[in-house]
Amino acid sequence: MAVFTRVLRDELEGWLKDYSVGTLTDFHGIESGIENTNYFVTTSEGEFVLTIFEVLKAHELPFYLNFMAHLANHGIPCPRPIANLQNQYLGALKNKPASLVSKLEGTSVLKPSPLHCVKVGKLLANMHLAGKSYPLNMDNPRGPAWRKIAAAKVWELDRKSTRLNSSHG
C-alpha cells in the first residue's frame, strides 16, 4: 500500500484553490509505490497526479521538480509539474511537501518486447540529451556515501534478526 497520508475531499479542494486547474471532480489513492503518497486527481480542467512526499524534505525537491519541467519542455514524455498561483511547483499539504503534475496516458508494460526495449533506449538517449542543458547539478543521494550507510544498517538489521530468530528456536 502506498497511501501513507490520507487526504479528505475538503482538504484537497482547499489545496487546489492555489492552482489554476479548475474544480475537483474526483480523486483516489494510488496503491502502488513504496515511498510517497500519490493520488489520481480529476478536475474540471483535466487529470493530474498529486504526490505527498513522505521522506524527502521541501528543500530537496526543487531540483527534481525543475528537472521534470525542463525535460517536459524539451519534449520528453514525463509528468509536467503544475505551478501554483505563486509560480511554485512545490506546495504543502497535511504539513508535508506536495506537488501536482500532469497525468500521463498509458499503462504499465509488464512483459516488454524487444521493440519496447528499443523505444525505451531511444527515449533514454533523448532524455540524456535534453538533460545536458539543465543548468543545475546535484550529488546522487543514493551514491557511495549512502551505500556505506545502507550496508551498515542492513548488516545491523540482519544481526538483530538472527538474534531474534535464534531466541525463538
PLM ranges: what are they?
Residues M1-T25:
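Juxta-kinase regulatory segment immediately upstream of eukaryotic protein kinase catalytic domains
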Residues M1-V3, G29-I34, I52:
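Short acidic/polar alpha-helix capping motifs at helix-coil junctions
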Residues M1-F4, P141-R163:
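Active-site catalytic-loop/activation-segment of kinase and kinase-like phosphoryl-transfer enzymes
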Residues L164-G169:
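Single conserved hydrophobic/aromatic residue that forms the stacking wall/gate
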Residues T43-L136:
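ATP-binding pocket architecture of kinase catalytic cores
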Residues H28-G29, A83-N84, D139:
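Proline- and acidic/polar-enriched loop/turn elements at helix boundaries
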Residues Y19-T42:
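ATP-binding glycine-rich phosphate-binding loop
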